[in-house]
Amino acid sequence: MKEAVIVSAARTPIGRAFRGAFNNLQSPSMSSHAITAAVARAGVDPAEIDDCIMGAAMQQGTQTMNLGRQAAMASGLPVSVSGMTVDRQCSSGLMAISIGANNITNDGSSVVIAGGCESISLIQNEHFNAHRVADPLAMKHAPLIHMPMLDTAETVASRYNISREAQDEYSVISQARTSAAQEASVYADEIVPVTAIKLVTNRETGEVTEEEVTLAKDEGNRPGTNIEGLSGLKAVRDGGTITGGNASQLSDGAAAVVLMDGTLASQRNLEPLGVYRGMAVAGCEPDEMGIGPVFAIPKLLKRNGLTIDDIGLWELNEAFAVQVIYCRDKLGIPMDRLNVNGGSISIGHPFGMSGARMVMHALMEGKRRGEKYVVITMCVGGGMGAAGLFEVL
């Protein structure tokens, strides 16, 4: 049976949306930094690449007209390299890798690029096109399908009695883990430094100027975050529990991996990071989309004959602390195996990128720790969960 292995991976640092380093960097260009580095690390001839599959959650503006193809061209790949773009919201990057792997195992591809990108700065702004976004028939059958993500998190908190204190405590741990990981250069093997032209707005005059910046690490971590500071933050909704401190950050970034037929990788004496073993998705009520992983993970494990205890590392996207807590406790995931170097609360969450970032990090960290299996999982906007299984090599 054919296997699809990941032979290389690379990503940009994650920039803060709107005021961060990548607030003026278009998505094909941003993606090209990750793609070019991943291809170079794999040592493949670009002409061998069959397809470039990129995930993006908001496909308009700089991410419209097929980001996958645009990114391939921005990377200087031959015109023979095709491209496609995937939207499964926050699992788009993971979905792209799954599709790429299946192209190898089932359709005969030898080498595929897969990953994801999101520029919140250039899309989620005053130019965002929300014209006729709500379809009346979809709303008839699922009235809450467009419920704001923050409100779905508040629903999970109230419905399942998860306190503000518990959410803040989890967020402190996430920030501390990322801070320690950055101090130890844990993310260095993933990241490619990126130089970009940043827009800087003078708060007093409104004047916008350009500044060349080079970003070499994720911008979002807040070292020294403590429970006293988080507990003092005002909830976004009156009487609510979700704050800017216990929710994921709005971010910009891109990630890419090179997938290869396992036999070909062996013939070339490559040392893959891991092998794709499968993916599962599941739907849930849109108003509690954050708990989606509790439906997707059992599917994934059952299909592969595994249990929770068989998984050495878990990466769960941390859209909100409340949904991580619920999923962790409902499934019995040990905290010492979950988001061991932090997650979207402390690193950032470029929607289309996150799944691909989590895959590469889980495989690299799993290799460092000598683990066999890792699971990447996330809640998905609209009321879904997704989970992917990889074996560390």
Where do the model's predicted regions map?
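Phosphate/pyrophosphate-binding loops at sites that engage ATP/ADP/AMP, CoA/4′-phosphopantetheine
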Residues: 37-50, 156, 160-161, 265-269, ...
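Condensing-enzyme catalytic core mediating Claisen C-C bond formation in acyl metabolism
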Residues: 1-27, 225-291, 295, 302, ...
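Conserved catalytic cysteine-centered active-site region
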Residues: 56-110, 131, 143-151, 224-249, ...
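Conserved beta-ketoacyl condensing-enzyme motif
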Residues: 22-112, 117-134, 191-215, 288, ...
